[in-house]
């Protein structure tokens, strides 16, 4: 099936990253500490990616680059094949990562002083992205369900916050970080 991706890769190979300027490992207090606070995977990069990087490095010039048409074509094709969604390449905005994308969204959709609603606890970079764009944080606390061992949305509180006259944007983290929960279709 075209939607099934088979990847043969060894995820059991341990790789020590201490002493490599690893933000995750070299800032840990001791060898007996397992740093689980950052989404920094401890698996070696897939060989196809390192080969592509070597090919680029072998060129020996690192000037400004543009995003090639093949990138946009691949994104459009993937979304159509995987989700049945069709859109044009002009609908895609390339960013260098999640945090710059969050900041760009806030900048595009809000004005200074607007409120941005989050459901906390949530990915820490949401907070600095909101502040750095001159907006005010409005945090709707998630409810921890001790029976189901998961976070749940407090819809009454969320509705109240979203109804505020200065609320302009809801930053939804899905899957939720740090809870790991994928919000259900009914919740969304």
Predicted regions and their residues:
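N-terminal small-domain helix-loop-helix segment of the aminotransferase-like
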Residues: 8-97, 104
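Short, Lys/Arg-enriched N-terminal segments with co-localized hydrophobic residues
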Residues: 1-6
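Conserved core of the PLP fold type I
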Residues: 62-188
């Amino acid at each position: 099936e075209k939607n099934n991706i088979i990847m043969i890769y060894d995820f059991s190979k341990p790789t020590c990253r201490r002493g490599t300027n690893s933000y995750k490992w070299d800032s840990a207090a001791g060898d007996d500490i397992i740093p689980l606070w950052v989404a920094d995977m401890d698996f070696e990069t897939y060989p196809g990616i390192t080969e592509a990087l070597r090919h680029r490095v072998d060129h020996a010039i690192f000037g400004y680059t543009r995003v090639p048409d093949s990138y946009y074509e691949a994104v459009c094709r993937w979304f159509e094949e995987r989700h049945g969604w069709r859109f044009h390449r002009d609908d895609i905005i390339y960013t260098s990562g999640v945090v710059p994308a969050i900041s760009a969204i806030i900048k595009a959709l809000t004005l200074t002083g607007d409120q941005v609603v989050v459901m906390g606890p949530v990915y820490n970079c949401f907070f600095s992205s909101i502040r750095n764009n001159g907006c005010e944080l409005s945090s709707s606390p998630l409810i921890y369900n001790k029976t189901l061992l998961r976070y749940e949305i407090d819809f009454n509180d969320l509705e109240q916050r979203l109804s505020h006259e200065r609320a302009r944007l809801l930053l939804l983290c899905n899957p939720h970080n740090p809870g790991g929960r994928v919000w259900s279709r009914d919740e969304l």
